[in-house]
Each structure stands twice: as C-alpha cells, then as structure tokens.
Amino acid sequence: MTDALENLRQHLSDELGATLRTAHLDRGELTVELSREGFPAACLLLRDDVACAFDLLVDVCGVDYSAYGEGLWEGPRFAVVYHLLSLKHRQRLRVRIFADDDLPIVPSVVEVWAAANWFEREAFDLYGILFDGHPDLRRILTDYGFVGHPFRKDFPLVGTVEMRYDADQGRVVYEPTRTEERVVVPRIIREAGEGRYNARNQ
C-alpha cells in the first residue's frame, strides 16, 4: 500500500505542479496541501484522472489552528480538510487547503462532489469559513439568528442569552441568561509527593 501511495504522491507532484504545496506520507496516509488558486482544477483532476479516480468524498471539515501545539503554530489559522476515497484503487487521500485569517474563503467543491453540499454548510456554520460558489451557503446546525461560530477557539465559553420555547408566542424566544457566569474546568490539586505517578507509589 505504501508503494501505491508513493506512486500517487509522485503522480500528483507531476500533474499539479505549483498547486501542490506539500505531500506528506506518514503511517500509510497521504496528506496533500493545495493552493487556493489551482484548487478547483486540482479537484477535477483528483476525480477524473484515471490514476487518481477519487470519486467519493467521505468528509469535509473545518479546522481552527489557533493555539495549536500549545501556541507554537505560526501558519494560517483556518483550513478545510477533505477526505477522499478511490473505490477503483482502494486508496484514501486527505486534502488540506488553508484560508485567510481575516476572511476565510475557499472555493466550493459542490460542482465536483455533490456530497460536499452539507459538509461545506457545516464548516461555514461552525467555523465561519465561506465557500465561494456554494449554491446554498446558510447555517445547518445552529439557529438562523445565532451569532458567531461555535467551533472557533475564540468563541466564548459562557453565553449571554438563553433560548426556550414560549408556548404563548408559539416560537423560540431569547432571554438574558439568569445563571451566574462561571466556567467550570476540572482542576486537580495534589500535595507534593501525592498521587499514583509519584516515584514512591511505583
């Protein structure tokens, strides 16, 4: 399998040229990073080229890399990751494309893989990543009046409003939260020399 993925990596390097930024093979998985400029054409090649034949889009997800690696990440904040499957060659491929930090926009792949429709809407809803050319880019999981994108790492942990169904009005209403603002994070404080990982206890 590794030989086949190595051949695929070389083929993609030959065919995609400058569009292919990196191709990393690790633990039997090939991950490629593509540039935004050549991304739509690269997706068509991944689907239609007989040596690739990635006809099945398994998943699309957004990623927020802020504070990644305990704050050591210096690359772009947002990325979109596509997981592809070639039924013909029985191979998987992970494709990553980065977006701008201030206004994250990447090209939509709905025209290439129709299954991307709801996945891209989910990434928009949860991360605020825009997909240029998407036929119906609107929220899919949160309420239409929801403010913000809850999977962003800077999204507040404590809300200021709560919603409930009001039977008299026959709709969901928003009200200021009545709970005390606090963040409950489990903390374990041990005395020196206490705990199962102490040298005395081994």
From Swiss-Prot:
Q: Which organism is it from?
A: Acidithiobacillus ferrooxidans (strain ATCC 23270 / DSM 14882 / CIP 104768 / NCIMB 8455) (Ferrobacillus ferrooxidans (strain ATCC 23270))
Tell me what reaction this enzyme catalyses: a quinone + NADH + 5 H(+)(in) = a quinol + NAD(+) + 4 H(+)(out)
Under which name does UniProt file this protein? NADH-quinone oxidoreductase subunit C
Q: Which UniProt keywords apply?
A: Cell inner membrane, Cell membrane, Membrane, NAD, Quinone, Translocase, Transport, Ubiquinone
Q: Which family does it belong to?
A: Belongs to the complex I 30 kDa subunit family.
Q: Where in the cell is it found?
A: Cell inner membrane
EC number(s) reported in the record? 7.1.1.-
Subunit organization: NDH-1 is composed of 14 different subunits. Subunits NuoB, C, D, E, F, and G constitute the peripheral sector of the complex.
- What gene makes this protein? nuoC
GO molecular-function term, one example from the UniProt record: NADH dehydrogenase (ubiquinone) activity
Q: Does the keyword Transport apply?
A: yes
Question: What GO CC terms are in its UniProt record?
Answer: plasma membrane
Report membrane topology. Peripheral membrane protein
Query: What's its job?
Result: NDH-1 shuttles electrons from NADH, via FMN and iron-sulfur (Fe-S) centers, to quinones in the respiratory chain. The immediate electron acceptor for the enzyme in this species is believed to be ubiquinone. Couples the redox reaction to proton translocation (for every two electrons transferred, four hydrogen ions are translocated across the cytoplasmic membrane), and thus conserves the redox energy in a proton gradient.
Which NCBIfam families does the UniProt record give?
NuoC_fam (TIGR01961), PRK06074.1-1 (NF004730)
Q: Which Pfam families match?
A: Complex1_30kDa (PF00329)
Its taxonomic path starts at: Bacteria, Pseudomonadati, Pseudomonadota, Acidithiobacillia, Acidithiobacillales
**Sorted alphabetically, which InterPro entries does this protein's record hold?**
NADH_DH_suC, NADH_quin_OxRdtase_su_C/D-like, NADH_UbQ_OxRdtase_30kDa_su, NADH_UbQ_OxRdtase_CS
